[in-house]
Regions:
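Conserved N-terminal alpha-helix of the aminotransferase class I/II PLP-enzyme fold
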Residues: 54, 61-94
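Short clusters of hydrophobic/aromatic residues that line enzyme substrate/ligand-binding pockets
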Residues: 8, 17, 60-62, 222, ...
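PLP-dependent class I/II
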Residues: 3, 26-32, 37-52, 85-86, ...
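Short acidic, glycine/Ser/Thr-rich loop/turn "cap" segments at secondary-structure junctions
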Residues: 56-59, 106
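Conserved PLP-binding active-site segment in aminotransferase class I/II-type PLP enzymes
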Residues: 1-18, 27-30
Length: 396
């Protein structure tokens, strides 16, 4: 075993957003943080070794992603997602969220519409609004805890009508989906993609959680389905979630369409770089030598997921959970507690002493829900679940 995922590592005092910004975010310091989507264990030893070696060189001048890194990414994507890409399609950046903002800025004008599918990762909304575009919600359908695209409503949104001042130019896809944990099937993606193609809507596909899939589920990049979707999609990826290196600010965008790629790069190059020295070193080490560590992490996370779902459904009345197909996030249905959203947030903070992401942060369909991060040692997870059980049951 490369590392002991069950070992607690103290993160307080490390300038961790998750652990050191509790007062600023929740108004209370003494909470168990299970919110921000990073992991509470060290990254792969191969990454740490590579960073130390680069640090020992002592000179940290301007840098660039070399051809070897591009080839390593091409091989990773082929092996893990069965997608043949060319290294020329890869555009490096310093994060998925900045890259999404640049894409919205590049491919919309003020007043254009961008479709998102809530409840969904909240920076999608700000990426649209910050760049002068208008958010259009195509809310996911929830059937007994399993979420699906509402394609009928999507068609209605895109239907031309005299009342519409503008039409949608982009759809931001979350795949796998944060926070509901869906790993979209090929057929679902193909139907969604077909509608976008028919209506000249480009797809921005955030696939940062692509490596977190469990059991029989398989991640399929929507751009890999056919040539038309490849030409119509920008795919956003990074090793940051997979290898717990979000603070190193390195990501990439796969853009097959040369015209779109050039337009994106014109805006990007004036705003952000290609990632810092240590981020690029970490990315190379991760995709070249991190396979064993990742496999062990996925096994541990899968057990965490099963443990949490069973514990909640058997021990915590008023809260239900469905095992996520992907991501290390669990979407808790708290509607059975019969609390308003403000009451629920107060209850989680002040009674359960937990820091979770309130469902309302994720937009429409988030009312009555909480998102819990399970990427932590089992002891931390058990403590969080026990806190929740005691609070709900009124145990002392």
């Amino acid at each position: 075993m490369e590392i002991d995922f069950s070992k607690y590592v103290e993160r307080k005092g490390s300038n961790s957003v998750k652990w050191d910004m509790l007062s600023e975010t929740f108004g209370k310091e003494d909470l168990l943080p299970m919110w921000v989507a990073d992991s509470d264990w060290p990254t792969s030893p191969s990454i740490i070794k590579a960073i130390k070696k680069r640090a020992d060189h002592g000179i940290f001048g301007y840098t660039f992603p070399d051809q070897k890194l591009k080839n390593i990414i091409v091989n990773w994507i082929k092996k893990h997602y069965d997608w043949d890409i060319k290294k020329e399609w890869i555009v490096f950046s310093n994060g998925v969220v900045p890259s999404l903002n640049i894409a919205v800025q590049t491919f919309t004008n003020n007043g254009d519409e961008v479709i998102i599918q809530p409840p969904v990762y909240y920076p999608f909304r700000s990426a649209v609004e910050n760049n002068g575009a208008i958010v259009v919600n195509n809310q996911l359908k929830n059937t007994n805890g399993k979420y699906k695209f509402d394609l009928k409503e999507l068609k209605n949104i895109l239907k031309d009508s005299p009342q519409k001042l503008s039409r949608a130019k982009l759809l931001i896809l979350c795949s796998p989906h944060n926070p509901v944990g869906r790993v979209w099937e090929k057929e679902e993606l193909a139907e969604l993609g077909k509608i976008c193609l028919e209506n000249d809507v480009k797809i921005l596909s955030d696939e940062i959680h692509a490596d977190f899939v469990y059991e029989d589920n398989k991640h399929t990049p929507i751009a890999s389905l056919n040539n038309e979707l490849g030409q119509n999609t920008l795919t956003f990826m990074a090793p940051s979630k997979t290898f717990n290196i979000a603070g190193l600010n390195s990501s990439f965008v796969i853009i097959e369409n040369e015209k779109l790629r050039k337009e994106f790069m014109v805006n990007k190059n004036g705003l952000v770089g290609t990632g810092n020295i240590f981020g690029l070193v970490a990315m190379k080490a991760a995709y070249q030598n991190g396979e064993k560590w990742l496999s062990e992490q996925l096994s541990y996370l899968n057990e965490n997921m099963k443990f949490a779902v069973n514990y909640i459904n058997e021990n915590i009345p008023g809260i239900t959970a469905r095992k996520s197909e992907g991501t290390y996030l669990l979407w808790l249905d708290c509607k059975g507690l019969n609390l308003s959203d403000s009451q629920l947030e107060d209850f989680i903070i002040n009674e359960a002493n937990l820091a979770l992401d309130p469902g309302l942060w994720f937009g429409q369909g988030g009312s009555g829900y909480m998102r819990m991060n399970l990427a932590c040692p089992r002891s931390t997870l058990k403590k969080g679940l026990e806190n929740l059980k005691k609070a709900v049951r009124g145990d002392q």
